[in-house]
Amino acid sequence: MVNAEDLFINLAKSLLGDDVIDVLRILLDKGTEMTDEEIANQLNIKVNDVRKKLNLLEEQGFVSYRKTRDKDSGWFIYYWKPNIDQINEILLNRKRLILDKLKTRLEYEKNNTFFICPQDNSRYSFEEAFENEFKCLKCGSQLTYYDTDKIKSFLEQKIRQIEEEIDKETKLGANKNH
């Protein structure tokens, strides 16, 4: 069975790529807050590179920070920590993003008429087909009407599935907090 840290790392890797994993792993291994300078020293890389990685991780919810002002210099010091306890919320947010994209695509499919090239399966909106006299731009073949009912049905099914997952996971999360 995969442990929570491995799942957390794999999720970060799939969303942000390998580049941020070294910073995330250091924070997980340390188990306490660290400054960007401490991380840079341990990884032997530039502080600016660490900050870029931390900002990417923070945008997706993998890490968070608290800031304090240095009494001597007046500069802010950022203390970073991993949000491994937020893994479910990160996944939920990702599902919501995917759901929005699927709904946008479904609207596009519903609101447009399409034509397809029988030779190379290139798909054109009505406007594109009309501009090109209903001929394929690649091979010149006559375009034929393309019925998008299967695509719309598939998108509707996926949307329902993800909505049910989000609803179920949101209720589970709410029950854990009580």
UniProtKB/Swiss-Prot annotation:
Highest classification ranks of the organism: Archaea, Thermoproteota, Thermoprotei, Sulfolobales, Sulfolobaceae
Database matches in Pfam families: TFIIE_alpha
Subunit-structure text: Monomer. Interaction with RNA polymerase subunits RpoF and RpoE is necessary for Tfe stimulatory transcription activity. Able to interact with Tbp and RNA polymerase in the absence of DNA promoter. Interacts both with the preinitiation and elongation complexes.
Family of the protein in this entry: Belongs to the TFE family.
MF GO annotations: DNA binding
Biological processes, Gene Ontology terms: regulation of DNA-templated transcription; transcription initiation at RNA polymerase II promoter
InterPro entries, sorted: TF_E_archaea, TFE, TFIIE/TFIIEa_HTH, TFIIE_asu, TFIIEa/SarR/Rpc3_HTH_dom, WH-like_DNA-bd_sf, WH_DNA-bd_sf
Top-rank lineage group of the source organism: Archaea
Gene3D superfamilies found in the cross-reference section: Winged helix-like DNA-binding domain superfamily/Winged helix DNA-binding domain
Domain notes: The winged helix domain is involved in binding to DNA in the preinitiation complex.
All copies of domain HTH TFE/IIEalpha-type, residue ranges: 4-88
Name of the protein this chain belongs to: Transcription factor E
Its job: Transcription factor that plays a role in the activation of archaeal genes transcribed by RNA polymerase. Facilitates transcription initiation by enhancing TATA-box recognition by TATA-box-binding protein (Tbp), and transcription factor B (Tfb) and RNA polymerase recruitment. Not absolutely required for transcription in vitro, but particularly important in cases where Tbp or Tfb function is not optimal. It dynamically alters the nucleic acid-binding properties of RNA polymerases by stabilizing the initiation complex and destabilizing elongation complexes.
Keywords linked to the UniProt accession: DNA-binding, Transcription, Transcription regulation
